[in-house]
């Protein structure tokens, strides 16, 4: 991050609401063609800060192993190579033809069985008695770390979600998707209202994107979001009373090799127009961590409303709300504190101790922080201070047993502010 971008980002987040998700006044999505003329600061300033979508050309993925090895000369999935590398893996597969609790039910299948199904599905004219099956949310990089699959583009390298979950060795938010023509993902916004990027290794996708706030017009009379935003039933004003106030979606057709950047809080629906393989990351950083925090507060409030009748007779009602929230979203307030702590401590370490040559040569969070520069670390700490201050003042957070937090939030905040002041001297 250069000084001009640091000044721009500091001014933006000082002047605007911490939960601002940006506006989108046109239907045009920028196409980034040339690597050599597009810098990290360009992306940060023009897309991350204002929370706007864009598409990167296939030039940004030309060197990836998956594009060389997973695809035939004709641009189709190379089933033989994939079977050779991953045939015995167990993978999550969704049935696109079945709706279950506003999503598609999943099962675990051997990868070789899924590929056999896919080949038969193509042979039968894209029909099967088993329905349209879509391999989704496969943690391939975690299961096969030795594979030369891809390199995360520098534009997406400030990735707090995967930095934290890698540190605690529990989970990650790096996925591979594989599916036949006609497979699709229902209407949704991404986990924690995170950013996402999605790279097509082969095939084509159609994206329908709705800027933050537009989803409110798509809710039914009970406040529920639709499963499919293209369904004719949305025209029924007795069920969807505000649908006619919604704007048409922003539509993107993504070609092979291209990367789509989906901003924070944008709801979307996605179709595979051909047999398609893609790589996806969900990620959070200093630009959208406040949006994540607002989402968590909204999620907790929804849980509290659901079990409000038990508030008086239940001694540990606030704790139960946190447990339910974590089961639904994957995180609670105390883990969110630990998330902020890990991010903060990694940056404090860089600012206070620098980075030795051996560490910078490795693929580690500290190396990524160093690559983005000291001013980026300061920006991250400033955003962490903002959100951590809000968390510490939150009444629901203060009702929890915080004695297990190490260090206590007051001490962490003091350390953060001191590190920022020293770095800016």
Curated annotation (Swiss-Prot):
PANTHER family: 2-OXOGLUTARATE AND IRON-DEPENDENT OXYGENASE JMJD4, ARGININE DEMETHYLASE AND LYSYL-HYDROXYLASE JMJD
Residues binding Fe cation: 188, 190, 268
All copies of domain JmjC, residue ranges: 141-300
Species whose genome carries this gene: Gallus gallus (Chicken)
Gene this protein is translated from: JMJD4
Coiled coil: none
Name of the featured protein: 2-oxoglutarate and iron-dependent oxygenase JMJD4
GO biological process, one term: protein hydroxylation
Keyword entries, A-Z: Cytoplasm, Dioxygenase, Iron, Metal-binding, Oxidoreductase
Cofactor dependency: Fe(2+)
Subcellular location: Cytoplasm
Family: Belongs to the JMJD6 family.
Gene Ontology MF: a single term: 2-oxoglutarate-dependent dioxygenase activity
SMART domains: JmjC (SM00558)
UniProt-listed Enzyme Commission number(s): 1.14.11.-
InterPro entries: Cupin_8 (IPR041667), JmjC_dom (IPR003347), JMJD6_ArgDemeth/LysHydrox (IPR050910)
Catalysed reaction, written as an equation: L-lysyl-[protein] + 2-oxoglutarate + O2 = 4-hydroxy-L-lysyl-[protein] + succinate + CO2
Cellular component aspect of the GO annotation: cytoplasm; nucleus
Main location: cytoplasm
Function in brief: Catalyzes the 2-oxoglutarate and iron-dependent C4-lysyl hydroxylation of ETF1 at 'Lys-63' thereby promoting the translational termination efficiency of ETF1.
A family per Pfam: Cupin_8
Cleavable signal peptide: none
């Amino acid at each position: 991050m250069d000084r001009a971008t640091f000044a721009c980002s500091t001014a933006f987040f000082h002047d605007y609401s911490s939960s601002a998700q940006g506006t989108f006044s046109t239907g045009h999505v920028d196409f980034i063609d040339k690597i050599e003329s597009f810098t990290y600061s360009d992306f940060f300033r023009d897309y991350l800060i204002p929370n706007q979508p864009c598409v990167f050309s296939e030039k940004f993925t030309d060197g990836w192993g998956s594009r060389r090895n997973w695809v035939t000369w004709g641009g189709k999935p190379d089933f033989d190579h994939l079977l050779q590398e991953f045939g015995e893996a167990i993978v999550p597969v969704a049935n696109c033809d079945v709706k279950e609790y506003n999503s598609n039910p999943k099962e675990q299948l051997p990868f070789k069985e899924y590929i056999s199904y896919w080949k038969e599905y193509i042979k039968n004219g894209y029909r099967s008695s088993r329905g349209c099956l879509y391999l989704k949310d496969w943690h391939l990089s975690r299961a096969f770390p030795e594979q030369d699959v891809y390199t995360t583009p520098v534009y997406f390298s400030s990735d707090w979600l995967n930095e934290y979950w890698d540190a605690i060795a529990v989970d990650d938010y790096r996925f591979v998707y594989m599916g036949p023509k006609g497979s699709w993902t229902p209407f949704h916004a991404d986990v924690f209202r995170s950013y996402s990027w999605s790279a097509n290794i082969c095939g084509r996708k159609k994206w329908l994107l709705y800027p933050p706030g537009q989803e409110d017009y798509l809710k039914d009379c009970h406040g529920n979001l639709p499963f499919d935003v293209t369904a004719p039933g949305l025209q029924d004003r007795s069920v969807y009373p505000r649908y006619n106030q919604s704007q048409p979606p922003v539509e993107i057709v993504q070609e092979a090799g291209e990367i789509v950047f989906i901003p924070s809080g944008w709801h979307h629906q996605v179709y595979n127009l051909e047999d398609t393989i893609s790589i996806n990351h969900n990620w959070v950083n200093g630009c959208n961590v406040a949006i994540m925090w607002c989402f968590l507060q909204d999620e907790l409030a929804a849980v509290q409303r659901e079990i409000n009748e038990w508030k008086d007779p239940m001694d540990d009602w606030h704790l139960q709300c946190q447990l339910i929230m974590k089961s639904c979203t994957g995180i609670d307030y105390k883990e969110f504190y630990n998330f902020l702590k890990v991010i903060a401590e990694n940056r404090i370490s860089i600012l206070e101790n620098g980075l030795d040559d051996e560490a910078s040569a490795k693929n580690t969070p500290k190396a990524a922080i160093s690559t983005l520069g000291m001013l980026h670390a300061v920006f991250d700490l400033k955003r962490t201070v903002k959100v951590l201050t809000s968390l510490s003042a939150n009444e629901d957070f203060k009702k929890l047993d915080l004695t297990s937090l190490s260090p206590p939030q007051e001490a962490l905040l003091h350390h953060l502010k001191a590190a920022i002041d020293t770095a800016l001297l």
